[in-house]
Amino acid sequence: MEKRLEIYLVLLSVLLFAFLTSHASAAPMTLRVASPYHKDSLLAATTKIFLEEMQKQSGGQITFTEFWGGTLVKPLEVLDAVGKGVVDLCTGLWIYAPGKVPLGTFEYNFIFNDPNRRTQSKIKREMYETIPALKEELAKYNIAPPLIFGPLSAYDIISRVPVKTLDDLKGKRIGATPTQYAPIAKAIGMAPVLSPAPDFYERLERGVIDMAFCGKEVLHMVKLHEIAKHFLSVELNTPTTMSLWMNLDTWKKLTPEQRDLFLKVGKRSEEVYLDWFDQHLKKVDEDFKNKGVMINKLSENDKKQWAAVMPDLPAEWAKEMEAKGLPGWKITDTYLELSEKAGWKFPRRWGQR
């Protein structure tokens, strides 16, 4: 009888422990989240979608105190703000901290890469899952593995003067960002003027530049189609720019179940974002048409000619990273292999040793 009572008490204790543990892990949680961008802006879309999906998936158990439009974190402050715990999560952009996280912008160096945004998202996610150095450079600043990999559209050109061919670009002054695109422009006789995207409008209006490089949605966001009526699709590079970063201490405090939930919601939000982006670009195209923007596409032959005279940016980047003790060649080789595996063929061979 005493033996049965002992067994009963042990089982009761186990069940009680399991009950308390499950309820503890399901305790409501409120996290601080920020974005340098307005809540309804293009560049905040990945973050906004994640919050909506998390609240649905968690049944309201995980909620957020939200800080939008740079009210708490400005673009150049993102890395430090997340790492130091000013916020628990924030819209993440590697491009604003290239000196601290130089590996995270690797894809910008692969000129004329696959413009399929889903492919680019998939490749970058796979590389972060298989190349430890990519996550380690964020962990160095106390940031957890990225939750979302959100691409923008391919870099194209909008111009105040007619442009259809490579010859039309020669001698033109072009607003360009990031800095590594300056030698690409110079390779065909263009004059690059380093400019952040918000400055494009004023510089075009004043005649400081003739045209600008950027993704179609960004060119539209800064309203260049109001003063520049010639669009040339060149598909120079399709980057996976947008992410969502979490403070590493916050991440470590999560239960295994909560971590799985955050990763699951991150992947789901990525899918929702890609679908949303497709629809957003349709609206951009319609607005371009309504505003009288003339659309042309650079020929494949012109792309090959341009690529042939460009510097080998992937190789240059790989060597620069290796000199810093970072796996530049591993990242370069892997990106090229995954691109080829996805069926993409570059107009020239990149990453030559």
What are these regions (language model features)?
Residues 27-121, 136-353:
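N-terminal secretory/targeting leader peptides
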Residues 4-5, 24, 174:
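Hydrophobic alpha-helical segments, especially transmembrane helices
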Residues 10-20:
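Bacterial N-terminal signal peptides
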Residues 20-26:
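Sec/Tat signal peptide C-region and signal peptidase I cleavage site
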Residues 1-10:
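Bacterial N-terminal signal peptides that target proteins for export
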Residues 128-130:
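Core domains of carbohydrate- and sulfate-ester-processing enzymes
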